[in-house]
Design a protein with these regions (language model features):
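Non-catalytic cap/lid and distal C-terminal segments of serine-dependent acyl enzymes
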Residues: 9-10, 24-328
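N-terminal export and membrane-targeting signals
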Residues: 1-17, 156
Length: 328
């Protein structure tokens, strides 16, 4: 109980007040970047239509101290309904990838081609872990404050949101849902890092990802032995109690080669670890009597064919939670 109380106090420090919407959202997206700013001065400095419905935004972010990219897929009725506000689906990338990964590796553009939802795929750094670092970038502020406000003020994003992510992005989806109650109506994790302190191996995976990208691993959440409460405040399993009321979907394999792997594929340690972390979170949710849709599908590696399959499997639930009927 003491740990939960301390975590709640830590969360209180990042509780966000949802900003009011401003008038004057645009009807046509082509052309110059929209002249809107977030409360802290973050702004879209350029936008590029890179494919049908696909818009890349370059954002000057005070939270990060640099520019960052976000890719959005516009709803198919964007132009036909110039005053509409759109439900939002955030898709979070994994370690060592970027904001282009979902459109590059999956059929998400086709999947959402008949569905009136704004799909948002933000940059999170190769090792950002969807967190405000103790010493470094403030990714959580960038995503949940700056980007959210810019989308609401310039790109007609509404107040109903779902979020999903793979690997490191699975941690982000569940962390953001737990740390900002009510911001997201549904969350999904595919092979997610859902218990970063499950074992020394789990801790080492986080610190090795950070150090392999040239950063001090203690700059993220501190020394895990000396600052366990900071780690707990960013660990989905420790935050599970705050997920009550959010529609949840969790999926992972066990690292053994499965039906979507090519011949000769070997055992995958990353998915084995993330499968164990996912199982631990599922056990915690059951202990707390928090419902979730669970797909612990056994053989399967830490790879895109499984993540795309689970995106399809979770898509109807994610859309239903934000009041959208998907076209299939």
């Amino acid at each position: 109980m003491r740990t939960r109380a301390v975590i709640l106090r830590l969360l209180a420090g990042v509780t966000l007040v949802v900003a009011g919407l401003v008038a004057g959202s645009v009807a046509s997206i082509a052309g110059a970047a929209q002249q809107v700013t977030a409360d802290d001065g973050a702004t879209v400095i350029s936008q590029t239509m890179v494919a049908p419905r696909t818009l890349d935004l370059t954002i000057q972010s005070p939270a990060l101290g640099r520019t960052a990219m976000t890719r959005i897929l516009l709803p198919p009725d964007w132009d036909a309904r110039p005053s509409a506000r759109w439900p939002v689906l955030y898709l979070l990338h994994g370690c060592c990838d970027d904001y282009t990964s979902w459109t590059r590796q999956t059929d998400v553009a086709a999947l959402t081609g008949g569905t009136d939802v704004l799909v948002v795929m933000p940059e999170a750094g190769p090792d950002g872990y969807y967190s405000n670092w103790l010493s470094g970038p403030a990714w959580e502020t960038f995503h949940t404050v700056e980007l959210r406000q810019l989308l609401e003020r310039g790109y007609r994003a509404g107040q109903r949101r779902a979020i999903a992510g793979l690997s490191m992005g699975g941690l982000g989806a569940f962390d953001y849902s737990a740390r900002h109650p009510g911001m997201f109506q549904a969350a999904a994790s595919y092979g997610g890092a859902l218990d970063t302190t499950l074992s020394q191996e789990a801790i080492d995976q986080v610190t090795s990802v950070v150090s392999s990208n040239g950063h001090d691993p203690n700059a993220l959440w501190g020394d895990p032995a000396k600052q366990p409460l900071v780690w707990a405040a960013h660990n989905p399993l420790d935050l599970a109690f705050a997920l009550r009321g959010t529609k949840l979907f969790v999926a992972a394999g066990n690292g053994q080669p499965g039906p979507l792997d090519p011949p000769g594929t070997g055992f995958n340690e990353s998915e084995a670890l993330h499968g164990a972390e996912t199982s631990a979170l599922v056990d915690r949710l059951r202990l707390l009597h928090i419902p979730a849709t669970v797909d612990l599908y056994g053989p399967g590696t830490h790879s895109w064919p499984y993540w795309q399959r689970e995106l399809h499997a979770s898509f109807p639930m994610l859309m239903a939670a934000i009041g959208v009927t998907p076209m299939v």
